[in-house]
């Protein structure tokens, strides 16, 4: 692994929330896997590291109404989404070059405010979301790239 790549992994491990994340433009390959393994090893023990499916729904990402708990409680009960669940952790976003502008805006807002505001289904909640985003941009050509807003 080249020195610059290792330095970037080390910097991200020292202050992941402060840096917000990294865009890693590389195809799925051994070098990329080695960099991700290095980052995992350098992060403090117990730091959550989760993959984000490209087609994740807004409810799974942001949260929403927990229908079962709402019916049982007789009042609206919020279900936290992945962005709130990942507070203090690292999210791996594979195929970031395929991310929609709307999804990029959601991630960007969370990175900027370090919180998730859930306003839907009669809910109005704010959850801490101090996370780090590792965007894996696997674009094969110059016109395939992740949204510039990230």
Listing of model-derived features with the role each one plays in the protein:
Residues 17-19, 55, 79, 85-87, ...:
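Short loop/turn elements that form and flank the Walker-type P-loop nucleotide-binding site
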Residues 2-4, 97:
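Buried, small/hydrophobic-residue-enriched core segments of structured protein domains
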Residues 13-54:
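Walker A/P-loop
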Residues 4-15, 81:
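Pre-Walker A adenine-sensing motif
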Residues 42-48, 52-72:
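Conserved NTP-binding/hydrolysis module of P-loop NTPases
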Residues 27-30, 34, 64-79, 90-106, ...:
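Canonical AAA+ ATPase core
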Residues 44-46, 88, 112:
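Short glycine/proline-enriched coil/turn segments at helix->beta-strand junctions
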């Amino acid at each position: 692994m080249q020195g610059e790549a290792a330095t970037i992994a080390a910097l991200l491990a020292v202050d992941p929330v402060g840096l917000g994340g990294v865009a890693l433009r590389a195809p799925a390959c051994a070098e990329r896997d080695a960099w991700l393994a290095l980052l995992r090893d350098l992060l403090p023990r117990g730091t959550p590291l989760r993959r984000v499916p490209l087609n994740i729904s807004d409810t799974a990402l942001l949260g929403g109404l927990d229908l079962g708990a709402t019916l049982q409680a007789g009042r609206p009960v919020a279900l936290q989404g992945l962005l709130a669940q990942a507070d203090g952790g690292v999210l791996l976003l594979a195929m970031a070059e395929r991310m929609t502008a709307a999804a990029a805006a959601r991630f960007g807002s969370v990175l900027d405010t370090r919180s998730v505001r859930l306003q839907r289904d009669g809910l109005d909640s704010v959850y801490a979301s101090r996370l780090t985003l590792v965007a894996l941009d696997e674009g094969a050509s110059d016109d395939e790239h992740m949204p510039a807003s990230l």
